[in-house]
Amino acid sequence: RTVFCHDPLLRGAIRLNLLTDRVDIVRDLGWRRNTSALTDTDVKYLLLYFEQNYGLTSEKKMTAALSIVANENCYHPIQDVLNGLVWDGTPRIRSCLHHFLGAEVSDYVEEMLKHFLLGAIRRVFFPGSKYEEMLCLVGGQGAGKSSFFRLLAIRDEWFSDDLKKLDDDRVYLKLQGHWIIEMSEMLATSSAKSIEEIRSFISRQKETYRTPYEAQPKDRLRQCVFGGSSNTLDFLPLDRAGNRRFLPIMIYPENAEVHILEDEDASRAYLLQVWAEAMTVYRSGHYSMKFSKSIQRQLVEVQKDFMPEDTEAGQIQGFLEHYTGSMVCSKQLFKEALGHTYDEPKRWQLHNINEIMNTVVTGWKPFSNPRMFAGYGRQKGWERDVSGNELPGNEDEFVELSEEECRQLELPKEWIA
C-alpha cells in the first residue's frame, strides 16, 4: 500500500471506476495498454515493477493493496464530465429533437426529453434512484435514432445497443459500465414474455449478482437509463391500463435541421450543451420527476397512436353510441356488443370487457351494487354518465324511460309478497 501511495510513478494512477465497478489505470505507466481497465497483463507488469524496485514478490499482497488503494482513490467519469460543463445560456432541450430528428417543437416533446435527461443525471449522481420510463423515438429507418442515443451518451463506451433479451440470466453484464442503453428497434421489448416483465425490468433499481472473482453476491445499483427506437408505429403493446413506462416521440427526418452524423463533432458539442442545460436545471432543484396533469393527459393520448388497433373496444364503443338504455353489464356487452349471442363468457373475457369499460369507453361510469338486468340476473355494471356535457338536455327536464329501462328497474317477482 505504501508503494502505491508514494511511488512517483504509481501515486494516483490506480483508481476505482464507480461506473464500471472496475479498477482503472488512469495514466501511462510505461507499457502498451489498449484500455484503462486493469488487466491480467497489467498485474504482471506491476508485480515485475514491485520486484525490481522494492524486492516485493507476493502477488497476493500486492493485489490486496491495489484493491484498497483503488477504493480509496475512486472516481466517476460521467460525474466528472457533467460537473465540468458550463452552459452558454442558450436553451436547446426544447428544440433538440427537432434539430436532429425533425420532431415537433412542443411542450410535450420538451418535457419527455427533459424527463429522460434528468433521470439519466440522477442515476449517475444517485445510483439506483427511481426512474421507470423509457424514451422511445419512432420513425423511418436511417433517420439517426440510434446515433442520437449514442452521441447523447457523450462517449461511445457509455452507450450500448446490445440488449436483446430481458430474460437473459446475464443481462446485468449488458448494463454494467453503460449509461444510456438503447433497445434497438424494440427487440428486447418484443421478445419479453409479457407486458409485466417489461415494466418490471425497466423499473428495477438494482441487479444482485456475483462475479466469478467475488465470494459473495453484491447489489449493483443501476446507473443506466433506457431508450427505445422503432420503425413501426404500433410498437407499444396493447395495454388499456396504460403504457406509462414508454414515452413515445414521433420523428420526421425530412423536417430535421441537420442529420446528426453530418458533422459528428458539431453534434457532440451541441449535445454537451444540452447536458449543460439539463445540469443547470438539476442543480437548481426546480424540477419534478412527475409529469403535470396536462402532460400526463397528452402522454396517454400520444401512446394510443402507437398501440395496435383495439377492435373490441371499438365494437363496444360503437354499440353504446346507439344503445338507448341507461345501464349495461359485462355479460350483456359480451353477447350483444361483441356478437357472442349463444356463448357463455369465460372469466378472462369478462375481465377484458371490464378493462375496456373502465379505461377506454367514455360516457359511462361503474356502479358496485348489483342491479337486475333482464336475461342476465343481478350484475354489477355501468350506468350512463349524465354529468356535465354528457347530460341529455336540461337536467331539470323529465326524461322518459324506454321500455328496456323500465324492465331493468322492475323488482324480481320473488321479492313481491
Locations of the language-model features?
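N-terminal nucleic-acid engagement/recognition segments and initiation subdomains in replication
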Residues: R1-R92, D107-E111, D343-E344, W348, ...
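P-loop NTPase catalytic core of nucleic-acid-dependent motor ATPases
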Residues: L66-Q176, I180, L338
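AAA+/SF3 P-loop NTPase mechanochemical coupling elements
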Residues: V171-Q176, T211-S229
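Conserved AAA+/SF3 P-loop NTPase catalytic/coupling segment centered on the Walker-B
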Residues: I180-I202, L236-G242
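Conserved catalytic/switch belt of AAA+ P-loop NTPases
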Residues: I195-K218
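A short helix-turn-beta junction within AAA+ P-loop NTPase domains corresponding to the substrate/partner-engaging
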Residues: L238-A256
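Conserved alpha/beta core segments of nucleic-acid transaction machinery
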Residues: V281-G325
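DNA-recognition alpha helix
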Residues: S330-Y342
